Amino acid sequence: MPQPSVSGMDPPFGDAFRSHTFSEQTLMSTDLLANSSDPDFMYELDREMNYQQNPRDNFLSLEDCKDIENLESFTDVLDNEGALTSNWEQWDTYCEDLTKYTKLTSCDIWGTKEVDYLGLDDFSSPYQDEEVISKTPTLAQLNSEDSQSVSDSLYYPDSLFSVKQNPLPSSFPGKKITSRAAAPVCSSKTLQAEVPLSDCVQKASKPTSSTQIMVKTNMYHNEKVNFHVECKDYVKKAKVKINPVQQSRPLLSQIHTDAAKENTCYCGAVAKRQEKKGMEPLQGHATPALPFKETQELLLSPLPQEGPGSLAAGESSSLSASTSVSDSSQKKEEHNYSLFVSDNLGEQPTKCSPEEDEEDEEDVDDEDHDEGFGSEHELSENEEEEEEEEDYEDDKDDDISDTFSEPGYENDSVEDLKEVTSISSRKRGKRRYFWEYSEQLTPSQQERMLRPSEWNRDTLPSNMYQKNGLHHGKYAVKKSRRTDVEDLTPNPKKLLQIGNELRKLNKVISDLTPVSELPLTARPRSRKEKNKLASRACRLKKKAQYEANKVKLWGLNTEYDNLLFVINSIKQEIVNRVQNPRDERGPNMGQKLEILIKDTLGLPVAGQTSEFVNQVLEKTAEGNPTGGLVGLRIPTSKV
C-alpha cells in the first residue's frame, strides 16, 4: 500500500510523521532506478539502532497537544505499564519519516500505475532476477507493517473502543479486557462482531487518534511481541507469538481472534502466506485445513464436546489463529507479483494431475470420428498451420476435421462401406458423417428426452411437423413466400453431390504445401487460400446437414404414419374380436400384431436416423433418385 504524502497534510499531523529519525529501507529516486543495473540498489541497509524509545518520552509529541482530553482514559495504562521498548520500536517503523519513500523526481508520483507508487519505471524493473525476488519483501508484508494502525483509524473510526487495561489480570478478575473489533482494510471477509457488554466495553465519545489506536494495539496483556532484524533479507520481519492464558471467560477467544486478525492484512490476489504455529492446544481437535487460519475461525465452528473441556478447546482453536512472517529458514518467500512461487511447486502438479487426466479423457471422447476424411494423417500434417490461422480458429479442431469429412460409402460397392464403418467404429465410439455439422451445443442447451413416466397428452410430440405440416398447427396462418429454406421436401441426389464436393475439397486442401515448409513471404498468401477453401467446405457442410435433416424428417413422418396404421388396425381387430367372441378360427391377437408390423413397418428410423440417411445415400448412389423414400416425387428440375 503506498504511503500518503505528508506534503499535503496539516502541519501538526505531518510533524508527527517527521519527528522520528529511524532510517529503515529507503526507496531511491527514479533517476537512480533508471540508471542503475544492480537490483539491490533499491534498499539501503539499516545502520544499527543506537537507542530505544519509550512511549512516555514522545507520547505527547505525537499527539501535538491537540487531544489532551483523550489521554484521560490512558492514565492508568501509562502508570502501570512497563517499558514496552520492542512494541514501540515496531511503532517507529510505522511512523518513520515518510519523505524517504516519496523522495522522487516529481510531485505527481501518485499516478494511476502501480509502478508509479513503487517508484519504478517500465524499462528498468529490479523485479527481474529470481534470486533477488526471493529476498525482497512481499507486498503483504509491507502492507501489514505500514497500513494497520493508520488505515484502521481512517476507515473504521466507529469500531474503535477506548478501554482501561490493567497488565495484571489476576488482581481484577471481574473485568474482561476487550480488544478493538476493527476489520482490516483490505479484508473481504466479514468479521465476527463482539458482543457489546456494558461492564467491559465503553464507546469512545470523541474521535480516536491514531496514537491512541497505537497504544491499544500494543498493550495486550497476553501478547509477547518479538522482532528480529535480518539485514540479509533487506527487510525487518515481525514475528508475533500469542501465548494462551486459560480463563473461564468465553469472550477471551474473540480477543485472541481479533488480535490475530489485526496482525494480518488480506491484499486481494497477493496475500501473506500463513505459517502454522508450533503451539500445543490445551484440549484441541483436528479441524479441516483452510488457506488461512482466520477463515477457520470465521467459517468453522468448533465441534461440540461434552463437559467443561469445550471452552478450553474453543480457546485453543482460537489461539491457533495467530500469524507470523518468519525468516527464510522456516518458509520460502513469495514474489510480490506471484511470478515465482516456490512453496507449491511440489503441490500443484499433484493437484493438477487428476484434472489433466480428466481433460485428456474428455479430449479423447470429444474427438468425433469422421467417415473417411478429416483423418489423423491430414491433421498431423497441418496441425501447426491451423493453430496459427486466426480466421478459422472460431471453428474448433473437431469442426475442422468434420469439415473435411467424406461419406463412409463409395459409389463402387456397398461392402466397402460396411468395412470402413466397422473399422472406424472400432477406433472411435462416436461417429460423425459428412452431413453431421457440429454445433457445439452443451447438454443444457439440448432438449431433454422425456421418460415414459412423464408422458401425457400435453408433452407427447405433436403431429404438426408432418409432410404437410405447413397447413396445420401454428403455421396455418403463415402466408410467407415459400423458398428453398421452407421447402422440406428431401433431395437425396443433392445431398450426394454435396458429399462429392466435400471429398474434392478435402483432397485439394490436403495436397497444399504445409505452411511451415513455405518461405516467410509466401506463408500469408497460402494461409489465406487455405482459409478460403476451408470456409467453402464449412458452408457446404451446413447445407449437407440441412438436406440430411430433410431426409430424417421424411423418414420419421413415414414411420409415424405406418405406426398409426398399425395401431388403428390392431384396435379394429380387437373390436372385431370383442363383437364376435365365437369366431376363434383365425390367428390370435399377438400373431396378428406381428404380421401387421412385419408387413407395414420397414427398417426403424426413430433412434437410428444416421443409419437411415446412410441407407438412403447408398440407394441414391446406386441410381435410385428417391433413395428409397416412400412417396417421394422429385421434379426433374431438381435432379
UniProtKB/Swiss-Prot annotation:
UniProt cross-references to CDD domains, sorted A to Z: bZIP_AUREO-like
UniProt-recorded Gene Ontology molecular function terms: DNA-binding transcription activator activity, RNA polymerase II-specific; DNA-binding transcription factor activity, RNA polymerase II-specific; RNA polymerase II transcription regulatory region sequence-specific DNA binding
Entry's Gene Ontology cellular component terms: cytoplasm; nuclear body; nucleoplasm; nucleus
Record's compositionally biased regions (Low complexity): 310-328
Ranges of biased composition (kind: Basic and acidic residues): 371-380
Keywords: Nucleus, Repressor, Stress response, Transcription, Transcription regulation, Transport, Unfolded protein response
Polar residues bias spans: 339-351
Post-translational modification: Probably degraded by the proteasome.
Keyword Transcription in record: yes
Residue ranges occupied by any bZIP domain in the UniProt entry: 521-584
GO terms classed as biological process: maternal behavior; negative regulation of endoplasmic reticulum unfolded protein response; negative regulation of nuclear receptor-mediated glucocorticoid signaling pathway; negative regulation of transcription by RNA polymerase II; positive regulation of prolactin signaling pathway; positive regulation of protein catabolic process; positive regulation of transcription by RNA polymerase II; regulation of transcription by RNA polymerase II
Keyword Transcription regulation: yes
Primary subcellular site in the record, as a coarse category: nucleus
Basic motif: annotated span: 523-532
Subcellular location: Nucleus
Induction of expression: Up-regulated by endoplasmic reticulum stress.
Residue ranges of the region described as Leucine-zipper: 533-540
Composition skew (Acidic residues), residue ranges: 355-370, 381-401
Region: Disordered, residue numbers: 302-422
Subunit structure and binding partners: Interacts (via leucine-zipper domain) with CREB3 (via leucine-zipper domain); the interaction promotes CREB3 degradation.
UniProt function note: Acts as a negative regulator of the endoplasmic reticulum stress response or unfolded protein response (UPR). Represses the transcriptional activity of CREB3 during the UPR. Recruits CREB3 into nuclear foci.
Family of this protein: Belongs to the bZIP family. CREBRF subfamily.
Name of the protein in its database record: CREB3 regulatory factor
Organism of derivation: Homo sapiens (Human)
